C-alpha cells in the first residue's frame, strides 16, 4: 500500500519537475 503512494509521489514530483523545467526554459528563451 505504501508502495502505491510512493510511486504516486514520484510521478507527481517528476511531473512537477518537468513542468518547472519547461517554464524555466520558456522564460529563458523570451528576453
Curated annotation (Swiss-Prot):
Pfam families: MP31
Entry protein name: PTEN upstream open reading frame MP31
The gene coding this protein: MLDHR
The keyword Repeat is assigned to this record: no
Keywords recorded for this protein, A-Z: Mitochondrion, Pharmaceutical
GO biological process, one term: negative regulation of oxidative phosphorylation
GO cellular component, one term: mitochondrion
Localization per Swiss-Prot or TrEMBL: Mitochondrion
Highest taxon, organism lineage: Eukaryota
Main location: mitochondrion
Assembly: Interacts with lactate dehydrogenases LDHA and LDHB; interaction with mitochondrial LDH leads to inhibition of lactate dehydrogenase activity, preventing conversion of lactate to pyruvate.
Naturally occurring in which organism (per UniProt): Homo sapiens (Human)
GO terms for MF: L-lactate dehydrogenase inhibitor activity
Tissue specificity comment: Expressed in brain (at protein level). Expressed at lower levels in glioblastomas than in normal brain tissue (at protein level).
Result of changing residue 12 to A: Abolishes interaction with LDHA and LDHB
Known role: Inhibits lactate dehydrogenase (LDH)-mediated conversion of lactate to pyruvate in mitochondria by competing with mitochondrial LDH for binding to NAD(+). Also inhibits cellular lactate utilization.
Keyword check for Mitochondrion: yes
